[in-house]
């Protein structure tokens, strides 16, 4: 059987099914950017490849997926980091005009080209560790023009680098100063102008919101979900990070792809997510960076069978992190996730959190040939080692 590329003498973690899907003597064959075969060499058809590589026992996993980032932004929040170290809370900083609003000012001042220029090094850091798909949110423009500018910048990242980009409109991220005291008026803008414009221009793959005391109420979040659904866009939600407003349950009832953060998630929210198949995206970098003490209810999520993804949450204020390898280690050490859960969290469950489970996230025939090839002895090394990048080769769409 003819194929474009063949990788042999490899060990595979296909991530298919519920475990790692380990194959000790494996082969991956691809043609036209799609996987033809991924499995035991003994069961492989007789392939006639245009290009074959012998991997000498290296491991192949699916390309890694970062399903929650805020890569596109200008400015930094190093000064706020110092304030937090001195005892100021995230809420206190936000209410004093810092936080998201300070990044908003810098992002509004930057043009699209500058935003791309600033985001590329962050994206490159993820790519260097095997990422083949990255979600990128807006949310620092908070006007129609500036949110669309951010989404265009996100699309341009995918043109500048060999990586899949999923752009998420996060217009309901914070209340801009010009709408102080009029959150409902700002939500009107998001629902009536921002979401329709992003959908009309094909700039957004999903819509997100920040349901929190310093963000938007459940009723306002529901309006955002309704507008997204009317525009034909799936939804996601920042929920239960700082308090429990029952946002995860609201998201699940709206059929959300994922609910993210979830430190304050309760049993009702877990049950709703399990019923809906909504992915729990945990963000250990933010938990670590803002020195949270309340852990997400991992045992409850496990018991209910809720799929768990993990992501960097790369952003300037609460998780200036651009390493999925470190994120996996944090997921294990801080949240007590297993190695299998961490690896699933940046592959098959991350794909599901983006609605891409039929396309990426596992090594299976018909899926995009997105691979990460590693110089390791066992998959646990990807979670165990700190400050270590054993990536040998990254393949995106067969190239």
Swiss-Prot record:
Keywords noted in UniProt: Cytoplasm, Histidine metabolism, Hydrolase, Iron, Metal-binding, Zinc
Disulfide bonds listed in the record: none
InterPro entries: Amidohydro-rel (IPR006680), HutI (IPR005920), Metal-dep_hydrolase_composite (IPR011059), Metal_Hydrolase (IPR032466)
Enzymatic reactions: 4-imidazolone-5-propanoate + H2O = N-formimidoyl-L-glutamate
Required co-factors: Zn(2+); Fe(3+)
Family membership noted in the UniProt record: Belongs to the metallo-dependent hydrolases superfamily. HutI family.
Gene3D superfamilies given in the database record: Metal-dependent hydrolases, Urease, subunit C, domain 1
PANTHER family: IMIDAZOLONEPROPIONASE, IMIDAZOLONEPROPIONASE-RELATED
Subcellular location: Cytoplasm
UniProt name for this protein: Imidazolonepropionase
Sequence positions that bind Fe(3+): 68, 70, 238, 313
Pathway: Amino-acid degradation; L-histidine degradation into L-glutamate; N-formimidoyl-L-glutamate from L-histidine: step 3/3
Residues holding Zn(2+): 68, 70, 238, 313
Residues where N-formimidoyl-L-glutamate binds: 140, 315, 317
Domain of life: Bacteria
């Amino acid at each position: 059987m003819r194929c474009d590329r063949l990788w042999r003498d490899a060990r595979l973690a296909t991530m298919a099914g519920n475990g790692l899907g380990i194959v000790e003597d494996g082969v991956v064959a691809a043609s036209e950017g799609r996987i033809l075969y991924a499995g035991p060499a003994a069961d492989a058809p007789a392939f006639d490849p245009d290009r074959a590589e012998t991997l000498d026992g290296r491991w192949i996993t699916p390309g890694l997926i970062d399903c929650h980032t805020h890569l596109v932004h200008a400015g930094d929040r190093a000064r706020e980091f110092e304030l937090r170290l001195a005892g100021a809370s995230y809420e206190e900083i936000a209410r004093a005009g810092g936080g998201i609003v300070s990044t908003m000012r810098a992002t509004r001042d930057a043009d699209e080209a500058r935003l791309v220029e600033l985001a590329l090094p962050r994206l490159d850091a993820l790519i260097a560790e095997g990422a083949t798909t990255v979600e990128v949110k807006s949310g620092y423009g908070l006007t129609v023009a500036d949110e669309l500018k951010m989404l265009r910048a996100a699309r341009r990242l995918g043109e500048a680098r060999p990586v899949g980009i999923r752009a998420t409109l996060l217009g309901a991220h914070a209340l801009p100063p010009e709408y102080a005291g009029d959150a409902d008026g700002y939500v009107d803008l998001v629902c009536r102008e921002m979401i329709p414009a992003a959908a009309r221009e094909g700039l957004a793959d999903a819509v997100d919101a920040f349901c929190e005391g310093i963000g938007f109420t459940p009723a306002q979040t529901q309006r955002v979900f309704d507008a997204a659904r009317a525009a034909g866009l799936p939804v996601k939600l920042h929920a239960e990070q700082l308090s429990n407003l029952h946002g995860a349950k609201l998201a699940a009832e709206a059929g959300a792809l994922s609910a993210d953060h979830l430190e304050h998630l309760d049993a009702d929210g877990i049950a709703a997510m399990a019923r809906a198949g909504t992915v729990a995206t945990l963000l250990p970098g933010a938990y670590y960076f803002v020195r949270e003490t309340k852990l997400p209810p991992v045992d409850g999520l496990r018991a209910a069978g809720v799929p768990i993804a993990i992501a960097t949450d790369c952003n300037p204020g609460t998780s200036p992190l651009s390493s999925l390898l470190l994120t996996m280690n944090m997921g294990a050490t801080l949240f007590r996730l297993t190695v299998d859960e961490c690896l699933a969290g940046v592959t098959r469950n991350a794909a599901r959190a983006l609605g891409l489970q039929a396309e990426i996230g596992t090594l299976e025939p018909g899926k995009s040939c997105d691979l990460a090839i590693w110089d390791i002895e066992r998959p646990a090394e990807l979670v165990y080692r700190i400050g270590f990048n054993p990536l040998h080769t990254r393949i995106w769409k067969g190239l």
